[in-house]
């Protein structure tokens, strides 16, 4: 969600701060700002909308100063505008904040009763007001910071700058991630290592309850009671990647076409291409002895987990409990230590998923993290890490991270089946061979289907509502297709299990309702065709996504039929992801929406 950067440097920092914010754009935002100290005075520039608005403002009205903080805001309290954009100033205190101050209403009332004047609608301003109040009362900056931290509740990462101490930044973490970066004669703070990667690869990740006092000479880390704590300094694997679309119009398009390559790279971590066998899974989780598996995630990652459930149950005969992370820990699920839990997150920082992870830890379960960021909080708090190796994903709507999650879950399910002795003789090699061939098949599909998808998207963009149907692993894929379309085109879309059509959704079917049916020629095909006939009988416009066998077997009239190669059931979800991603992408392009950063969405959701 919000992104934070801070620099205590030796040269002007404003442009460097804005450049670092560009590396946090993928998290989602609706406004941005930067502040510096120069000659004992603080100044700031803030702008609503895209970062180029802030960049232009800083270019027209430069900000001198070698110490500064910057922020991209995703609105939680108060509308997205310049006034509510960070940094917030109160009496010589500047604050940037990621998260939610849960008791801000109570604090705002208390401070207002004492005479404080609030100029924004944000929860963040209470932090600046409290710090200003405590320093007026005579507390030093460190003492004021600690008193404030023990007075606010919620999830937050904070960086604070005091006008009368121009060589120091104070920071704290209680929930959302925050990292300290070590340079030569300068120091950095950032929401993640990617933001700091142009400056340094030497990182310390703060943990919940840490407060860091950062100067040019280094960082002192204390807990919220003021006691010194030691945190490991490590070399980050994040690289200063170039934020470049290449020859593509959008990052999402680029990331769709990167999938064959990144999936091949991910698979090489989990399967042996020469022997056609799975590599041993992380030994921290013994799949052979498990009585069950819990899976939890949010959004697209949750839908990859739903597909993974089918695989673990089918190939490893392993019972799987799955729920969205925001509900998981509140259900009081009867868990036992003979189970393990997998948590799936592109960023590894999703707040609800982390909360569910910690719930399972308390229940004594071994924890596995399926993440794209090895240095994330989720990875650091897990017993086993299963990296998806998708590379940086900038588009808010996940594409390559989703299919890499699927590739990893498929590999783990086969590995679990091997460990548990539930695979038939020769089945491991057969399944691994399908996984090995998958990137080639996906590349072929991408080279063939775009013209048809693009033409179809023009027609689809005229409709206000769309249904997606599927059975088996195609049901979660229908949910994912609907999610993608609504995320980036803003067309209302819903996904259903095809067998549920008669239990309600069929009431919506008429000539104004496109119905996208995902149906490879598998063991569910004939039943899905029966559902298609029910749609056709009511005038629904069918878009049929199937394979060569399915196209030959169905004689129904459709609005369009997208025909893919015949593939094994194991890899079908990855291959069939491609047309639903491209369909959503091109529909959004025709509608003129912001494909890479759709309204109201954030890439990394770090608050509950």
From Swiss-Prot:
Its main location: cytoplasm. Residues 2-217 form the Glutamine amidotransferase type-2 domain. The keyword Nucleotidyltransferase does not apply. GO terms for cellular component: cytosol. Its EC number is 2.6.1.16. One of its GO terms (biological process) is carbohydrate metabolic process. InterPro entries: GATase_2_dom (IPR017932), GFAT (IPR005855), GFAT_N (IPR047084), GlmS/AgaS_SIS (IPR035466), GlmS/FrlB_SIS (IPR035490), Ntn_hydrolases_N (IPR029055), SIS_dom (IPR001347), SIS_dom_sf (IPR046348). Keywords: Aminotransferase, Cytoplasm, Glutamine amidotransferase, Repeat, Transferase. Catalyzes the first step in hexosamine metabolism, converting fructose-6P into glucosamine-6P using glutamine as a nitrogen source. PANTHER family: GLUCOSAMINE--FRUCTOSE-6-PHOSPHATE AMINOTRANSFERASE, ISOMERIZING (PTHR10937), GLUTAMINE--FRUCTOSE-6-PHOSPHATE TRANSAMINASE (ISOMERIZING) (PTHR10937:SF0). HAMAP family: GlmS. Homodimer. This is Glutamine--fructose-6-phosphate aminotransferase [isomerizing]. The lineage of its organism: Bacteria, Pseudomonadati, Pseudomonadota, Alphaproteobacteria, Hyphomicrobiales. The gene is glmS.
